[in-house]
Amino acid sequence: MHFTAIVPLVLSMGAFVLSFLALFAGHKEGFMEDYDVVRLNMSRLGYNLLNTSSDGSSDSDSWLDRITDVARDGFSDLINDVGNDVADRLADELGISEWYSLHLMDVCQGDFAPNVTAPNAWLNVTECTQPRPGPNVNLTEMLDQELSIGPLRVSLADLSWPDDIEGTLDKVNKFLLAIFILYVIGIGFSGLSILGSLAAFFLGFRKLVTITNFVFTVLASIALLAGSLITTIGAKEGAKQINDIGDDIGISAEAGQKFMIISWVAFAVIAAAAVYWIAQFCVGRRSRSRAPRRTYTEKRHKQGSF
């Protein structure tokens, strides 16, 4: 047994577990919910327009007038009831969740507990979509449906929902699918690296075993590196675009920092395993080159020819 093979074995297992957790984060209610890729905050949806409408009540085409046409006196009651706590109750009065989180396999939604303005508020998950590769959920359709059955029975059109947000969310859905595929590849090669490390543990650092393990770890590293880069760039850029577009109606988005951390750590761990195997290959090659070569006479003598 070659106990030094435990090093790449542990590294490969670490990358496998971290990648697996990142892939399945949020796939059911309450499971690693805070490891989302992007989270949308809807707790202030319509809040800015509410202020604008209150200040410009003389405008017959104001947002408040349109809401009143749809919900009659419902929104007026909301203004009186909510008062200074509008940030805590507006989403509830509209009939939507306060946040929506995008994971690699689904979309979850819920409320901030105990409320959105509380320090260190935690995420109370109320529902998640069915897990599938790259959730590809139409958030506009989901919100419109929730608003239509809410207390005020309004629509996104009444809230001046910008069409550009859906275009941005479509891009986010595409890079979520790309990340999903890359993580599946990374998990697969990390698993093969585990098996290869076990082979090295029992069989020794043979040339074929070393090269095979190096190939497995390099391919896993490439997949996880690409996934981490797409996550970091795509999530941050997607959140930035949503913030720019949705600021006027109170929508904000945030890239998942915890997901990025676990993603980069998984890459770093499997990359360390790849470095180990290339170092092991170099050491083995140097040892073979320094080994004394027997002469033809010595070989014949060992075979009993003399």
Show which residues each predicted segment covers.
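Intrinsically disordered, low-complexity terminal tails of fungal membrane proteins
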Residues: 1, 58, 284-306
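Beta-strand-rich luminal/extracellular ectodomains of secretory-pathway glycoproteins
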Residues: 1-115
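Transmembrane alpha-helices of multi-pass eukaryotic membrane proteins
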Residues: 3-12, 179-186, 207-217, 256-266
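Helix-to-loop junction signature of class
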Residues: 22-29, 226-246
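Transmembrane-helix exit/juxtamembrane "anchor" motif
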Residues: 27-28, 233, 274-293
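Membrane-proximal, non-transmembrane alpha-helical segments
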Residues: 121-189
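Juxtamembrane interface at the cytosolic side of transmembrane helices
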Residues: 177, 184-230, 279-284, 288
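Short, membrane-exposed interhelical loops at transmembrane-helix boundaries
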Residues: 242-258
